[in-house]
Design a protein with these regions (language model features):
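Active-site neighborhood of phospho(di)ester-bond hydrolases with catalytic His/Asp-centered motifs
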Residues: 5-7, 28-33, 66-72, 97-102, ...
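Active-site environment of divalent metal-dependent phosphoester hydrolases
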Residues: 10-17, 36-39, 73-84, 99, ...
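A basic- and aromatic-enriched beta-loop-alpha substructure that forms the phosphate/nucleotide-
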Residues: 65-147
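Active-site-proximal loop/helix segment associated with metal-binding centers of metalloenzymes
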Residues: 116-214, 221-225, 229-230
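Beta-strand-turn-beta hairpins that frame and shape the catalytic cleft
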Residues: 1-4, 103-117, 161, 265-270
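N-terminal active-site segment of His-dependent metallophosphoesterases
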Residues: 1-68, 76-82, 180, 187, ...
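Binuclear metal-dependent phosphoesterase catalytic core
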Residues: 227, 233-251, 259-299
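Soluble or luminal CAZymes and related metallo-dependent hydrolases
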Residues: 45-52, 83, 189-200, 235-239
Length: 299
């Protein structure tokens, strides 16, 4: 099966971007941040109420099935749960397959392919100094602070690292104007959503499957996907998780979020990202609009 991968098109900034189907592709994967309604959105100015997704609609001419995993920016300027419902309705109306904590199996001549999708979000613990191997099976406590733990304990160091990651993330999250239940959707709420996604993802990957497994997330599963322009800083934990122990359960992991491409193999899994990014930041040179990943090459 040949998979075309696109992410981080940010159509709110690039509304005239016109994607082309990759010749020979069997399916298109949209790995999040396709379009949003943040302040100044050109989609909103032009009256596009479909997050820019109509141009990918199989009902409007896109030639192959389209799988959509929402990114973080789809929720900008909106209530989280209202945006979620609106995105689901949009996908159903346009004929896109919604993959937020959903699994779909597609037939292929070489054998079935299972797509497991979730935004994933971030638990902000990717850079926490571990008191056990990095591939830790359980995340740190959902709610805790360094002031609640012994000052020299490994847990305190982990919580300090998380607190730094929270502060870095909240600097930007406050600008997005996203809310949930009337409250700003900030780092702690993102973490809690991430833990829900992680629990679901672990359960989905644990289900036996005789075929190829492809995971699609918006947030990255590993620090190996970190943007080399910035190195490893507290802000990196808002883009990458440290879920490397899950990689062996899949043959292919597709993601977005970072505006830097990835294409590497780790722990038996190929990890690929193909973001467009922002033109104003000079991030688009490495984007491959017709990128295809052939699952036959994963063996």
């Amino acid at each position: 099966m040949k998979i075309q991968l696109l992410s981080d098109l940010h159509l709110e900034s690039h509304p005239d971007f016109r994607p082309q189907p990759a010749p020979g592709a069997d399916v298109l994967v949209l790995a999040g941040d396709i379009g949003s309604y943040q302040a100044g959105s050109l989609l909103a100015e032009r009256g596009d109420a479909d997050f820019g997704l109509a141009r990918f609609s199989p009902r409007h001419g896109w030639p192959v099935p389209v799988l959509f995993v929402p990114g973080n920016h789809e929720y900008d300027g909106l209530d989280f749960d209202e945006a979620d419902a609106r995105l689901r309705e949009t996908c159903a109306r346009l004929g896109l397959t919604w993959l937020e904590r959903e699994t779909v199996v597609m037939a292929d001549a070489a054998g079935p392919v299972r797509f497991i999708g979730t935004t994933l979000w971030s638990d902000f613990d990717a850079l926490a100094p571990p008191d056990r191997p990095v591939a830790r099976p359980q995340p740190l406590p959902v709610r805790a602070s360094p002031q609640q733990t012994p000052p020299d304990s490994p847990l305190t160091e982990q919580l300090r690292a998380r607190d730094k990651a929270f502060r870095a993330a909240n600097f930007y999250l406050r600008k997005t104007s996203g809310t949930r239940g009337g409250q700003p959707f900030l780092a702690q709420a993102v973490r809690e959503q991430s833990l829900v996604c992680q629990q679901w993802l672990r359960a989905a990957l644990a289900q036996p499957f005789d075929g190829t497994t492809v995971v699609i997330t918006h947030f990255a599963p590993s620090l190996r996907s970190a943007d080399p322009r910035y190195g490893l800083t507290p802000g990196t934990a808002g883009f990458c998780n440290a879920l490397d122990e899950l990689l062996p359960a899949a043959q292919l992991w597709l993601h977005g979020h970072l505006h830097a491409p990835s294409n590497y193999r780790h722990r038996g899994c190929r990890v690929v990202a193909n973001p467009l990014g922002y033109a104003r930041k000079g991030e688009q040179a490495a984007f491959a609009p017709l990128l295809e990943i052939d699952t036959a090459s994963l063996v």
